[in-house]
Amino acid sequence: MIVVLVDPRRPALVPVDAVEFLTGDVQYTEEMPVKVPWSLPSARPAYDGEDAPVLLSSDPEHPVVKARLAAGDRLIAAPEPQPGERLVDAVALMDKLRTSGPWESEQTHDSLRRYLLEETYELFDAVRSGNADELREELGDVLLQVLFHARIAEDAPHHPFSIDDVADALVRKLGNRVPAVLAGESISLDEQLAQWEERKAQEKKVKARASSMDDVPTGQPALALAQKVLARVSQAGLPAELIPASLTSVSVSADTDSENELRTAVLEFMDTVREVEAAVAAGRRGEDVPEELDVAPLGVISEDEWRAYWPGAESSASEAEPEE
């Protein structure tokens, strides 16, 4: 006498050890999808007649299942769920909402931006609070945003992608960034960090930026944006004296919109950096090569080049010339 327990999420997937026993007299519990018993030649309901040699079910708490196991029936069960299997359910749920929900079906990447920002802040607060229940809930809310945006992307007329593409990109990135760790090699913290930065730099060479300001997310809070931009221009070799004080000194008062003022200053500074980088590239290119045919990477800009092409440099130089 045998009890076969299948995964309730995939009831049609039968454990391989049970296949040989399903060709004869089989009973099934009522929650099983009708297509499963229909595919078995001699299947009948659990309460129909005497006990069959095999009982097929997806419910370990079903009275008949519990009774037969208590009587000593052999159990053949589906493998235990692997970590991440509930993510499959979450993906399916998001697909149902996107296709059937009046609100979900109308959303776009842009319309969800404020929710993504709000949920990120709430997750930050949950981390700070140390409350495990809040952290679990807020992680779920952020996961919802990831699933939602990925599902919206499936409907895009140009360059669509799915949640599997998102996961694949992450797996590829991590596989490239920390191959030693994933290969099981012994590696120190410093070695791992060095490998991460080295691999990251290699990726950037393949995907060369036209500007040091490329890929800076401007939707982040103004202070975080300013810090990111300052880090970028520092890496790009911009002399410190060219950074305006409006980016490094923030005044906060009740009657000023400090967030908006700082953001405006940072965005204007980013535009200036891009303009100077373009001017440097044009100066190096010369007049004989059209801009659209110039595929050479910008490379390193020296401090002298930054100063020479920075707005106001010519007027400053003329003011500094001694009178004859």
Swiss-Prot record:
SUPFAM superfamilies: all-alpha NTP pyrophosphatases. Its cofactor is Mg(2+). Gene3D superfamilies: MazG-like (1.10.287.1080). GO terms for biological process: dATP catabolic process; dGTP catabolic process; dTTP catabolic process; dUTP catabolic process; TTP catabolic process; UTP catabolic process. Induction: By oxidative stress. InterPro entries: MazG-like_dom, NTP-PPase_MazG-like_N, NTP_PyrPHydrolase_MazG. It catalyses: ATP + H2O = AMP + diphosphate + H(+). It is an enzyme of class 3 (hydrolase). The keyword Endoplasmic reticulum does not apply. Keywords: ATP-binding, Hydrolase, Magnesium, Metal-binding, Nucleotide-binding. CDD domains: NTP-PPase_MazG_Nterm (cd11528). Required to maintain the full capacity of the mycobacteria to respond to oxidative stress via the degradation of the oxidation-induced damaged nucleotides. It hydrolyzes all canonical (d)NTPs, as well as the mutagenic dUTP and 8-oxo-7,8-dihydro-2'-deoxyguanosine 5'-triphosphate (8-oxo-dGTP). Also involved in the transcriptional activation of RelA in response to oxidative stress. Belongs to the nucleoside triphosphate pyrophosphohydrolase family. This is Nucleoside triphosphate pyrophosphohydrolase.
